[in-house]
């Protein structure tokens, strides 16, 4: 599975994942909205929005 792994609004980069899912975490801090992308479907703390999906580059 190919997942996107760029941070926030950086140009898209991808990585090959052994997991069968990709994730996208979104939260806000003093710098504004932050986005983290990667492989798998991690646990997140309250207040962080998590989207997981199972197709190539679905977490862009």
Curated annotation (Swiss-Prot):
Domain of life, source organism: Eukaryota
Gene Ontology annotations for the cellular component aspect, listed alphabetically: extracellular region
Species per Swiss-Prot/TrEMBL record: Aipysurus laevis
Paired cysteines (S-S): 3-22, 17-39, 41-52, 53-58
This protein's UniProt keywords: Acetylcholine receptor inhibiting toxin, Disulfide bond, Ion channel impairing toxin, Neurotoxin, Postsynaptic neurotoxin, Secreted, Toxin
Molecular function in Gene Ontology: acetylcholine receptor inhibitor activity; ion channel regulator activity; toxin activity
Entries under InterPro entries matching the protein: Snake_3FTx, Snake_toxin-like_sf, Snake_toxin_con_site, Toxin_cobra-type
Family under the similarity heading: Belongs to the three-finger toxin family. Short-chain subfamily. Type I alpha-neurotoxin sub-subfamily.
Protein name in the entry: Short neurotoxin C
Upper classification of the organism: Eukaryota, Metazoa, Chordata, Craniata, Vertebrata
Main location: secreted
Function field: Binds to muscle nicotinic acetylcholine receptor (nAChR) and inhibit acetylcholine from binding to the receptor, thereby impairing neuromuscular transmission.
Coiled-coil portions: none
Tissue spec: Expressed by the venom gland.
Cellular compartment(s): Secreted
Record bears the keyword Oxidoreductase: no
């Amino acid at each position: 599975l190919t997942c996107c792994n760029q941070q926030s609004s950086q140009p898209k980069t991808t990585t090959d994942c052994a997991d069968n899912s990709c994730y996208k975490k979104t939260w806000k801090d003093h710098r504004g909205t932050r986005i983290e992308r990667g492989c798998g479907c991690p646990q997140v703390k309250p207040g962080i929005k998590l989207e997981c999906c199972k197709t190539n580059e679905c977490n862009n």
